[in-house]
Amino acid sequence: MGRVQLFEIRLSQGRVVYSPGEPLAGAVHLRLGAPLPFRAIRVTCMGSCGVSNKANDGAWVVEESYFNSSLSLADKGSLPPGEHNFPFQFLLPATAPTSFEGPFGKIVHQVRASIDTPRFSKDHKCSLVFYILSPLNLNSIPDIEQPNVASTTKKFSYKLVKTGSVVLTASTDLRGYVVGQVLRLQADIENQSGKDTSPVVASLLQKVSYKAKRWIYDVRTIAEVEGTGVKAWRHAQWQEQILVPALPQSALPGCSLIHIDYYLQVSMKAPEATVTLPLFVGNIAVNQTPLSPCPGPGSSPGLLSPVVPSAPPQEEAEAVASGPHFSDPVSLSTKSHSQQQPLSTTLGSVSVTTIEPCVQVGSPARHSLHPPLCISIGATVPYFAEGSGGPVPTTSALILPPEYSSWGYPYEAPPSYEQSCGAGGTDVGLIPGS
């Protein structure tokens, strides 16, 4: 047995999650097998953020500190063999950001203890990481309870000489959600052509922006649901549900190096059309009476009014006039519904949309219509760095503090819109454990 048999930090009541502005109390525990002369015993509470240009590289190129406080627990002397406890207490700053860890950077809060020994003797050090969770109240975000709507019109040619257009409109019932809540999606597709469209796909995306020497964008697909295509000259309506899994909150107030955004992207490949809805993920839910999950088939649940061009181009108007007249919207069925498995390191297939990254000098735009995205399913994390030739896949999974990871992760997708209606209208938006 050595001279120092035990040297560790213990926090009061075994806590590991704290809120900004709270006191953090604990003690340094020391067990000695022989007398230990020392010059000083110190404890430090610190919080910082570091960002790297390379994935899983601890050599930070940019750092910022949030707090760094030290206490002297004992001055020069000698400790006899046996157990020794040195209590301490710090007050966490009210502006401390939420803990976060990703492949290109992290926000870490920790307590470090050290024993400075006389010259030619080995110093002793230990540390303990704790988590800070600064709850995001979604009700503090303006218009958070309002429906989220976006629309696009795509004009295209087919059969060499014919032209047509597709109007894609997507909406969600809210602009912000909490873990375990159901996101209700509605998409209206008006096919003003004689050609069938490809399937419509909705993806819940997470975009983490890291400010190193240049902005690095880490984008992953959290969940994806696919519906069928729309027949020629038809107006279709697609309604689906996505269960919000355990995710870090939107933004990271107090941190200027890492920013988190969420988007719901609804797209079709043929014709190529995409709409992107910015979303917020928070910790305190929106104060709103839940909407009915089962509006009548073909009827609008009040989420949106389909956007149709009031004055289409002449050739498009002629094409519409020559084609069949639109009837009431038909309901699209769902082909597949997938949710990312937790902390998986298996690489998924990557479908790349090559987009040149935009040079950004300030903070990344929170409501950009289309961030530089590369879509993937599963744990593959592609990213774009300025000047890079394309996306680079990584296998790092986001490390969530215990407050997040304690939620029941949805291994299975939530019921589809049709299934939820068939179950008698039971609300599936309950938080796990409630």
UniProtKB/Swiss-Prot annotation:
Maturation and modification: Ubiquitinated. Ubiquitination by WWP2; promotes localization to extracellular microvesicles. Ubiquitinated by WWP1.
Motif PPxY motif 1 positions after renumbering to this chain: 401-404
Main subcellular localisation: membrane
InterPro entries in the record: Arrestin-like_C (IPR014752), Arrestin-like_N (IPR011021), Arrestin_C-like (IPR011022), Arrestin_domain-protein (IPR050357), Ig_E-set (IPR014756)
Complex formation: Interacts (via PPxY motifs) with ITCH (via WW domains); the interaction is direct and participates in the recruitment of the ubiquitin-protein ligase ITCH to the NOTCH1 receptor. Interacts with ARRB1 and ARRB2; the interaction is direct. Interacts with TSG101; may recruit TSG101 to the plasma membrane. Interacts (via PPxY motifs) with WWP2 (via WW domains); ubiquitinates ARRDC1. Interacts with SLC11A2; controls the incorporation of SLC11A2 into extracellular vesicles through an ubiquitination-dependent mechanism. Interacts with WWP1 (via WW domains). Interacts with NEDD4 (via WW domains).
Family that this chain belongs to: Belongs to the arrestin family.
Name the UniProt record assigns to this protein: Arrestin domain-containing protein 1
Species of provenance: Rattus norvegicus (Rat)
